[in-house]
């Protein structure tokens, strides 16, 4: 089973009433396949999972797996505050045909380090699927290198989703545990992550620019660094506008610009305005031109 590679942190399409648009899931998953990415990471931050009930999250895991129908590698994010809820989602992911699970640390309460470590050990012990630890210090308690090394010593913990700008720590993880899979988590630092040893990347903007990041990965692997830097800069121009607009609603708006259903984000995320759409269209135009040029060359 190949778990390395480029994964979109799959968005969740909503209808105008903020219910999950189940009719749109197939089109979104089909687009991920056409982008040529390796898989999808379902139910994470980009999917607005923390704005959903457990039943909604479980249903979405099932719907995405059915739509993918074996065409993509599937990683289910099952992270929650409560260990029992993460275990429930983990069991559901296994039944739905996922290849791995991932989990952010328990948050909101000031859990002790032993409590956080015990949470992961129990999840890894019980899960029928391999576990990828989600290291996201900007949103939850981060991990020290010794803590990550300890977690990765568990036979069912196979990797780290490193959503951090700390490239020193990323490289030290790769050095300390060479067999672990390390996924870069910040899209705007994808090339840096690969340069420091990441074997994969999981990102929000891969939902609509996954083909660009596949090309970036291939250029980096082939030593074509200037070309990879050019692709990273092209992506970063889009990301810079997304940060101003709001990454979640802006990303869904970009799906709409590309003719795909995304819908709004759930409140309290704001609605995208016309001025935002104009800025997003301008920013993504070079990516669309690159895609068209690349498509012509491959014909």
From Swiss-Prot:
Q: Give the main EC class.
A: lyase
Q: Where in the cell is it found?
A: Cytoplasm
Pathway field of the UniProt record reads:
Amino-sugar metabolism; N-acetylneuraminate degradation; D-fructose 6-phosphate from N-acetylneuraminate: step 1/5
Q: What residues does aceneuramate bind to?
A: 45-46, 163, 185, 187-188
Q: Which InterPro entries match?
A: Aldolase_TIM, DapA-like, NanA, Schiff_base-form_aldolases_AS
Give the principal location in a single coarse category: cytoplasm
Active-site positions on this chain: 134 (proton donor), 161 (schiff-base intermediate with substrate)
Give EC number(s), comma-separated: 4.1.3.3
Q: What is this protein called?
A: N-acetylneuraminate lyase
Q: Which organism is it from?
A: Rhizobium meliloti (strain 1021) (Ensifer meliloti)
Q: What's the encoding gene here?
A: nanA
């Amino acid at each position: 089973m190949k778990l390395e590679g480029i994964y979109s942190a799959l968005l969740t399409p909503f209808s105008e009433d903020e219910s999950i648009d189940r009719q749109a899931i197939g089109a979104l998953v089909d687009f991920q396949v056409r982008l040529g990415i390796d898989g999808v990471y379902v139910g994470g931050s980009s999917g607005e999972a923390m704005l959903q009930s457990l039943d909604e999250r479980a249903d979405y895991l099932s719907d995405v797996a059915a739509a993918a129908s074996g065409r993509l590698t599937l990683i289910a994010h099952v992270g929650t505050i409560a260990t029992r809820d993460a275990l429930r989602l983990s069991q559901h992911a296994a039944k739905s045909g996922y290849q791995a699970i991932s989990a952010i640390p328990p948050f909101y309460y000031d859990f002790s380090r032993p409590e956080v470590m015990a949470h992961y050990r129990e999840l890894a012990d019980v899960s029928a699927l391999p576990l990828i630890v989600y290291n996201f210090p900007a949103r939850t308690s981060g991990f020290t290198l010794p803590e990550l090394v300890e977690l990765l010593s568990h036979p069912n913990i196979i990797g780290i989703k490193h959503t951090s700008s700390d490239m020193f720590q990323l490289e030290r993880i790769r050095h300390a545990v060479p067999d672990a899979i390390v996924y870069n988590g910040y899209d705007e630092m994808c090339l840096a992550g690969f340069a420091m040893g990441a074997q994969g990347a999981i990102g929000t903007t891969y939902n609509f620019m996954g083909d660009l990041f596949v090309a970036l990965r291939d250029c980096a692997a082939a030593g074509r660094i200037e070309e990879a830097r050019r692709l990273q800069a092209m992506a970063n121009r889009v990301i810079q506008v997304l940060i101003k607009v709001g990454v979640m609603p802006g990303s869904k708006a970009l799906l709409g610009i590309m003719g795909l259903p995304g819908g709004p984000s759930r409140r309290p995320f704001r609605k995208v305005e016309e001025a935002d759409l104009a800025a997003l269209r301008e920013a993504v135009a070079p990516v669309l031109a690159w895609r068209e040029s690349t498509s012509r060359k491959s014909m």
